[in-house]
Design a protein with these regions (language model features):
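OB-fold nucleic-acid-binding modules
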Residues: 1-189
């Protein structure tokens, strides 16, 4: 939507702030009727929803011109990820931070109830469709020097690259993204 390196200011009037997995989330008020997809009666009520693109564009102001050199990532290793059972302050320190992990590759697996599982051929993309349910898709990556050290990225099916194929496991590179936490009943994070 906007070029990388574009600084923006967001006018929050008319938007709502909530949380997802203890991270602040900016969106629009949305009433979950607990009748669609995998929703359950316990989730019925108001929550934060996605910001439609036209609404997003009305709420931003561009500051200066895009400058990719000003994107500041924190280099990190898999071992440095705070454990999901860490105290709130540790999680709060890292959640939402833009980090880069070098020398990793995709294993072409996902977490299934907290354990690595091979992907079907059709699912070897970043985020297969959830038919509108919208839960993030986990894709496992490993450290080249120690393949037993793994973690995962979560990608929304709404991402521009959602249906792009995962790189072959012999492709080693860097992953840049925001740290977030997700905890399901199966124990994956």
């Amino acid at each position: 939507i906007l070029p990388m390196g574009q600084v923006i200011a967001i006018k929050c009037n008319g938007l709502a702030i909530g949380k997802y997995a203890n991270m602040a989330q900016l969106g629009v008020p949305f009433f979950n009727n607990a009748k669609e997809g995998l929703d359950n009666a316990g989730k019925k009520g108001w929550e934060i929803g996605r910001i439609p693109l036209p609404v997003f564009m009305e709420h931003i102001q561009l500051i200066g011109t895009p400058d990719i050199s000003k994107i500041d990532t924190v280099p990190m290793t898999i071992d440095e990820f705070p454990a999901i059972d860490a105290d709130f302050m540790t999680i709060a320190k890292w959640a939402g931070r833009l980090v880069r992990i070098d020398n990793v590759y995709f294993t072409r697996q996902e977490y299934d109830y907290g354990k690595p599982a091979d992907l079907d051929e059709a699912d070897k993309i970043f985020a297969p469709s959830t038919n509108g349910i919208g839960y993030p898709q986990s894709r496992i990556f490993a450290l080249q020097s120690d393949p037993k050290k793994i973690s995962a990225i979560g990608t929304s099916e709404y991402a521009k690259f959602a249906d792009a194929p995962l790189p072959a496991s012999d492709y080693v590179g860097s992953i840049t993204g925001f740290i977030s936490y997700y905890w399901d009943k199966g124990g994956s994070s």
